[in-house]
Amino acid sequence: MSKLWGGRFEKTASDWVDAFGASIEFDAQLVLEDLEGSMAHVTMLGDQGILLKEEVTQILDGLQQLKQKALADELKFEVYHEDIHMNLEALLHEAIGPVAGKMHTARSRNDQVATDMHLYLKERVKEVIQLIESLQRELHAHASENVETIMPGYTHLQRAQPISLAHHLLAYFWMLERDKERFTDSLKRIDWSPLGAGALAGTTFPIDRSRSAELLGFNRVYPNSLDAVSDRDFILEFLSNASMLMMHLSRFCEELILWASEEYRFITVSDTFSTGSSMMPQKKNPDMAELVRGKSGRVIGNLMGLLTLMKGLPLAYNKDLQEDKEGMFDTVKTVQGSLSIMAGMMNELTFHPDVMKKATERDFSNATELADYLTAKGLPFREAHEVTGRLVKYCVDERLYLRELPITVFQTYSELIQEDVYHALTPEQAVARRNSYGGTGFDAVREQLKEASVCMSTMTYS
């Protein structure tokens, strides 16, 4: 059997060359998008009088039959036909005969595959946004229940200041909100149609690219045919946005892993999202969180891979671009799976407020409160910082905490310190008083929750 492009060749490729050059193993995932693109293209060819009405009807009927078989997973593809485009054309030829050869009029596989990927990512991005929103709901629900749950806040992984657990959870809510905004904004650039650009220079046929774009639901058409077939910015942008999202999930998972350890005991991860050890009977491992953390690396790797592939390509199409798909497919699967796991894990997560609160009572995370206390009494902040630092040093030497010091010791360092200092140094006061906008104070966090609720009320795809 001759290749569909085989007219110029005297020799046929060997089986191992066919296997090396074929992409059907992975681009079969574009089967529905490819069929949709072909239907729009053929409809446009008919509208423009390039194909006869009966030819259009015959081809569309055949494509519809292939679509039904695709939905039923009944299509069989062959490596010999290289990719999804030529496999479908061969199957169409079997179904309706030689008229199938007219389907590819005024089209190249270059604009065809680009169209497929635009269609594919357009829907996958919407699905990712919906999954982000599901995780945001879980975070918001836990935050609403834990406004006055006090926990240590950290810098350098050292206890820094007590904060509200809700405040900590909402930090991730806002990270996800930015992720969602980036994905949403990227749809503007995914929503361009390359169909009709041909191999690189357009076509001599009187096609209507706006009509095929309209049929496919695209908002605009690439104005340059070279750019249309060689552009992979929209995939790179998706991979970049996905990498940032996975980085956020990885950071959160790192904290969940720490919090679930015996050293913290801030949370209990549900058995549903944990595994055991084949050797150590006592083990309960937060494997799902660890996997999400680990999978962030492969998504970032997919971005680096495509950036490296693209950096040396001259215009327009090059076979290298066949390598753009596997990383895209892998990233879609990884991101969607990670978001689903995270939402489920958060839904069944148990927090331990008593353990969190206790952790803030046996440390020096209230030292900033003492410095602020002295500053409010009229001492310049730098002097207050110095006095507080010397008091902390004294406590460390004496193996005491600030609230355990007698008032006489406090007043040795500053006569401004009075009995009311003990109330000011409680974790509750340390958190409650920080009501600047965006702060961890209970009132400020309640206002923040209201802002988050507004975001949730306008969720795009839920």
From Swiss-Prot:
One of its GO terms (cellular component) is cytosol. The keyword Cytoplasm applies. Its main location: cytoplasm. Transmembrane segments: none annotated. PROSITE patterns: FUMARATE_LYASES. It catalyses: 2-(N(omega)-L-arginino)succinate = fumarate + L-arginine. It is found in: Cytoplasm. Its EC number is 4.3.2.1. Belongs to the lyase 1 family. Argininosuccinate lyase subfamily. HAMAP family: Arg_succ_lyase. This is Argininosuccinate lyase. It comes from Exiguobacterium sp. (strain ATCC BAA-1283 / AT1b). The gene is argH.
